[in-house]
UniProtKB/Swiss-Prot annotation:
Pfam families: UPF0060. Coiled coil: none annotated. The keyword NAD does not apply. Keywords: Cell inner membrane, Cell membrane, Membrane, Transmembrane, Transmembrane helix. Belongs to the UPF0060 family. This is UPF0060 membrane protein azo2656. It comes from Azoarcus sp. (strain BH72). Signal peptide: none annotated. It is found in: Cell inner membrane. PANTHER family: UPF0060 MEMBRANE PROTEIN YNFA (PTHR36116:SF1). It is a multi-pass membrane protein. One of its GO terms (cellular component) is plasma membrane. NCBIfam families: PRK02237.1 (NF002586). InterPro entries: UPF0060 (IPR003844).
Length: 110
């Protein structure tokens, strides 16, 4: 799998997880409708399925995915929550992405 496809798959996985967690948050914390739980469950099921599409050992996928999750969560903070990220939010998310790149794309011995 190419680096771009891997990154796009990680991004889709992160969005599915964040949506799946955000909707119950809206229901519980912001007096949203209980109907939000249905798309939340579907989104979390999609998240779990997307994790199976990554072509590496599960532990490596989970570790690398964490870096992308941090980056997407900061974008969510800005785009959905309406909170502008600080320079430290951006710096931390870029460091996390660098960690993901090392974990996923470093040369491996045979």
């Amino acid at each position: 799998m190419t680096e771009l496809k891997t990154l796009l798959l990680f991004l889709a996985t992160a969005v599915a997880e964040i949506v799946g967690c955000y909707l119950p948050y809206r229901w519980l914390r912001e007096d949203g409708s209980a109907w939000l739980l249905l798309p939340a469950a579907a989104s979390l099921a999609l998240f779990a399925w997307l994790l199976t599409l990554h072509p590496a050992a599960s532990g490596r996928i989970y570790a690398a995915y964490g870096g992308v999750y941090v980056f997407v969560a900061v974008l969510w903070l800005w785009g959905v929550d309406g909170v502008r990220p600080t320079v430290w939010d951006i710096t931390g998310s870029l460091i996390a992405l660098c960690g993901m790149a090392v974990i996923m794309f470093a040369p491996r011995g045979a």
